[in-house]
Amino acid sequence: MAHHHRSTFKAKKPFKSKHASKSSLKEKYKNEVEPHRSGPKNIVHTSTKADRRNTAKQIQLNKRTEVAMNNRIFGGKNGAPKVITIVPLCNNVDSWNVLTNLLRSIDPEASLPKFDKDSISYSTTIDRFKQNLLFLLPKREFYSLIDACKVSDYVIFVLSAVQEVDEFGELIVRTTQGQGISSVLSMVHDLSEVDSLKTRNEVKKSLQSFMNFFFSDQERVFAADVSQDALNVMRALCTSHPRGIHWRDSRSYLLSQEISYSNGNLLVRGIVRGKGLDPNRLIHIQGFGDFAINRIYEAPQGIQNSRGISMDEDTNLTGGLVELCSPTQEQDSLESLGPIIDDMDTDMDSEVGKEASRGVRLDDFYYFDDEEEPVAVAKRVPKGTSTYQATWIPDEDEESDQYSDVEDTEVIIEDQDNQEISNHVAEEKIDSDEEETIDDAKSEMFVDLSEEEEVRQYEEYRKKQKELQEELEFPDEVELQPNELARERFKKYRGLRSLYTSQWDADEYDPNEPREWRQLFKFENYRNLKNKFLKQPFIGEAKPGKAVYVELRNVPIEIFEYYNKPWNLLVLYSLLQYENKLTVSQFTAMQHSEYEEPIESKEELLLQIGPRRFMVRPLYSDPTASGASNNLQKYHRYLPPKQAVIASVISPIVFGNVPIIMFKKSSDNSLRLAATGSYVNCDTNSVIAKRAVLTGHPFKVHKKLVTIRYMFFNPEDVIWFKPIQLFTKQGRTGYIKEPLGTHGYFKATFNGKITVQDTVAMSLYKRMYPLPCELFKVTDIDS
């Protein structure tokens, strides 16, 4: 007989609903609300041929409208001229000869006017293409060339057929590429001097390969001495539309055609470009600073270049001019710092110093002996506030807008401590834990040095390279001398349970903070403010393409004397609201591949950001880690090679992803491209934490109990740093248990067994404050 499995004894199965009645289902779900169903998901909408044709037609119409709006300022007889800069990349290139060939290609029989080669500009009207052109031919000087490229609609790079691009020419190309450049054309000079046709083609291919390395859209190199090629260049200049520079076109700027000066007022004539010119915004003049607009007047349209000299105090510059617009009560102030806070009780040095002298700090608490209770860190409160009232004062909310799109890195090292910041130069006091200060690295000079000087520079270079190598191999490690007290050397340091989760109050009272730190401007949401200023439409009379007179007030006579020379180019850049206010600016920085010397934190560099230049000493740090719940950034002593980090300085705020370039000045006043990047954020709540790692040697090991030596050299230091967590290079963690003897030996317990080959370490952290920038003035170019 076949085996038969018995049935289950459970006859009633209430969880089965196969035969449930309607009434039972209603009873079961009577208190539930049926979810809203918007319809079936994943509906595939099939578009017809007419729909696709209509969509393409709308896209095409939008593009045509956009191009027409952008070309409007260049159209017509009185349209704004297109600005074209001719950049010679070799010593034997004559820019005026190239300009002559371009103009003769339009009409070979026409007589050209005599050029004023002392002038930087030449204006002309091309009747054949009904276009006004303004050629800029700056001298082969660094600042003149890059400033002209910055304001140009087209840049023509001219190479030589018989000479290679020198180091200076390559620096110009890399700088213009880094700062942002509009449309680019490439030409070759003296191609007729090459004998055979085959060699000419090889030269053109080689030069095109060179230009394609920097600008991939360069499909051809035109010959300047070939009439047809020159005509093609002129046709491209007159009929095409320039690509533009995003950061420049999002602001208003004006290229001067005429300047006059009287009684502290500077009158500049030019055509408004970019966005409309708002009289309530400040004007930046490169190399001199920010100035306020007094009034804006109408000017006749058309090309006009002259230098008006009017220095009599009784002369009225604006006599007979029609006022277009003037500033209101909402005009931006020239003050770059906030008001001094004098209602806060800052007499806390003794209290904080008393707490700091009783124990080490772990996160936001000072840890004393076991019989004492930990005391919270002191806060800044208004004068007359009692202890009970102070507990009701909430801490400020931390900024929620954190950037997390930058790589997280690991290398950090010791550096000098900041004490005070003056309005121009920060006063630095070197901690006892600092190594000997290293002079700035010298660039290679093209003159023979003395044997002693060569030896000195070589030793200096090797020393800096050795420090960088040690930094990469043993990050943050410091050594204590046997006669040195750790609690004194690391008095300003604290312990952190985790660099990614431990909180650090950025607004706590710190006796070591700079004097102007509380006057820096803070913004609740930088991203929203940036979008507001960059996307808001312009409402006013000084629209793009309109010729105007701009009157600036309280202008020094030195500006007129400098820019009244025909070879100097004056450009007025309008700043967005708040862009003259000082704050903690943060931007990405990556060392340039051609710059091989180590770049140290606080090393003086020339920073160019948009139209402004500053002398800065940035602090390098990792960005706040992605997903981290705090505002900590790990400090770097050196700018890590081939790695993007955050550079922090106290400078005026910038709105938008503006490119930055940093240069290193050498002893012969030449510049080397050191680093590039872009503006990221302004954030005074970010804490740059410098880490110091104390290391010790396992002397005796008994399972998880280890005797450690050479980390401290007296029992008082062991007791002082007892709350700080220990870790090993192999991943174990532990805590100090008790000191042993009088030479700094101590017992420690770990979460696992360690070996005598392992290294025991302890991390301590100190806050670093960014240093202020200095405006790079025109007078500093030759100094």
From Swiss-Prot:
Stretches the record annotates as Disordered: 1-56
Every Bms1-type G domain range: 80-243
The protein's name in its UniProt record: Ribosome biogenesis protein tsr1
InterPro entries from the UniProt entry: AARP2CN, Bms1/Tsr1, BMS1_TSR1_C, G_Bms1/Tsr1_dom
Major localization listed first in the record, in broad terms: cytoplasm
Compartmental location: Cytoplasm; Nucleus, Nucleolus
One example of a Gene Ontology biological process annotation: maturation of SSU-rRNA from tricistronic rRNA transcript (SSU-rRNA, 5.8S rRNA, LSU-rRNA)
PANTHER family listed in its UniProt record: PRE-RRNA-PROCESSING PROTEIN TSR1 HOMOLOG, RIBOSOME BIOGENESIS PROTEIN
Family per record: Belongs to the TRAFAC class translation factor GTPase superfamily. Bms1-like GTPase family. TSR1 subfamily.
Biased composition (Basic residues): 1-21
Organism: Schizosaccharomyces pombe (strain 972 / ATCC 24843)
Basic and acidic residues bias: start-end ranges: 24-37
Function: Required for 40S ribosomal subunit synthesis. Required for normal export of the pre-40S particles from the nucleus to the cytoplasm.
Domain of life: Eukaryota
Keywords: Cytoplasm, Nucleus, Ribosome biogenesis
Cellular component annotations (GO), alphabetically ordered: cytoplasm; nucleolus; nucleus
Disulfide pattern: none
A GO molecular function held by the record: U3 snoRNA binding
